[in-house]
């Protein structure tokens, strides 16, 4: 991974000790892998699948790297679908940070669980944090007009109704 944790991930195969092999997985491929994993058990990519994909990214790469990985992945996906206007920078980052906050509080391991599948872990996580499955959750933190603004679509805008929980806890 790059020094800031946001570049391509380095993958060390199981035989790495013997061969010294290392592979670099570009962010686009990491996002595609996460998307394929989420969609393997889904008929459509709705809000729950967005949260699941985000949770996987946070769990495997940490919140800071997941902001970029998920943001760029969704932006590229919207562009490829001919709907670049569907990408929303503030909403994407806010959701990643909310999922990351709750994953950290839940004691979710960022390196994956050895005794349970990611799917089972996600279902348990979603059961513990049903508020994350509420598409209107961001309305607790942002005015509708703020989220509808061109500024919020194009880049990060801080909440204007209430601070995120991790800011309030400081």
Labelled PLM ranges:
Residues 26, 38-108:
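Conserved, aromatic- and glycine-enriched, well-ordered alpha/beta core segments
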Residues 23, 27-31, 43, 47-51, ...:
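Active-site-proximal alpha-helical scaffolds that flank and shape metal-associated catalytic sites
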Residues 2-22, 29, 108-120:
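Intrinsically disordered, low-complexity terminal tails and inter-domain linkers enriched
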Residues 88-170:
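A charged, amphipathic interaction segment
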Residues 21, 45, 84-85, 131-132, ...:
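Alpha-helical interaction segments
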Residues 12-14, 25-26, 129, 164:
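Intrinsic-disorder/low-complexity coil detector
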């Amino acid at each position: 991974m790059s020094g800031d944790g946001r570049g391509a991930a380095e993958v060390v195969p199981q035989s790495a000790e013997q061969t010294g092999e290392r592979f670099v997985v570009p962010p686009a491929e990491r996002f595609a892998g996460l998307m394929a994993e989420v969609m393997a058990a889904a008929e459509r990519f709705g809000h729950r699948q967005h949260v699941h994909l985000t949770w996987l990214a946070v769990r495997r790469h940490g919140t800071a790297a997941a902001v970029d990985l998920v943001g760029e992945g969704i932006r590229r996906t919207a562009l490829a679908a001919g709907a670049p206007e569907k990408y929303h920078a503030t909403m994407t980052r806010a959701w990643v940070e909310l999922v990351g906050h709750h994953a950290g509080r839940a004691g979710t391991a960022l390196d994956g669980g050895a005794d349970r599948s990611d799917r089972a872990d996600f279902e348990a996580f979603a059961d513990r944090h049903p508020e994350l499955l509420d598409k209107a959750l961001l309305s607790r933190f942002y005015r509708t007009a703020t989220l509808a603004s061109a500024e919020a679509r194009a880049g990060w805008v801080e909440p204007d109704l209430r601070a995120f929980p991790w800011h309030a806890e400081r």
